[in-house]
């Protein structure tokens, strides 16, 4: 394994200062060292791998050699959430949750996605500059609470907004990576407030013994209750879906708006495509834009694993108990795989072209591929098509940089001027997604 000398270290530091993100140093190290390197930080020296071959080892062929992680803020917050448990426990929770996120359920979710999007966008004044990072978060939060838990949180947004953001901040990378026991102030109260809110939803549903009959439907919350899970385990799954689900959708929507704003010609092409149809199954350019947004700025940009058994990456060995990061961000920008890898080129996904192997993994891969992958992509298609049909978006040309939080999001936000289009739009115009 090549060492990081002082010259390369200075280049990495300069890149960090220039890009205001650790992604800069990662790109520098990857370009000079290759697909495997170790970052020599104080008290923390994680190994980093990327590329299709490494992804195959970590996600498929040798996945039993890696475990999720030791105790940290993520495990503290999410408890036994499906995202972070291993083995049979993971498989059990996943099996319980998959029916509510299956593609067959998406048609009934479409109406909710549109109505929640309309709710938020109806608050915009014509010609107003809005932050599409914030607005996307509102939309995604409303959608996930309504579709998976049948909970309308519109009137509670002010109540849960800060607790949700503090929860995301709590699990975002920070000094705790270097020093696990570092004091962290200002989290206890908002995290408890969010817990109380979720436990309240569970309690309310348990009291409604005939909810399925009266509502004529079922949802994820009901599946978990019917499975006999404790309130604590149900809370863990709810919080996992709430935080991981809505935060990834927020990042995807915000980055897509940013990219369209930075590429007005493609923006107009997408608008023209959407104007020609009410069928959300027939928007190939929009689908390619979403895929390219996921390639350039994957919401979950890095996977964090702990080595349970020594692993070998092309002769480079990682001992047991070491920390391994597999970088989705670097994989998606590999110049050996992607032509014009740093550029926004939606056409690269045209004509049904599929990236080779595991060189494209915005939702992970293998048996633990993101349980909400299809839901998230359909949600993006519905929200974007509805808003682009209803509004013109003008980017304000401010500088944006990727921020490595719980997800990879555009900072300081995506400021866009919104103007209502004369084209009439309502939810009944859309055909259901099949």
Regions found by a protein language model. Give the residues of each.
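Conserved cytochrome P450 K-helix E-x-x-R motif and the immediately C-terminal K′/meander segment
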Residues: 13-34, 196, 278-314, 335
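Cytochrome P450 proximal C-terminal region
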Residues: 30, 117, 134, 160-167, ...
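Cytochrome P450 heme-thiolate "Cys pocket" and heme-binding signature region
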Residues: 95, 244, 302, 316, ...
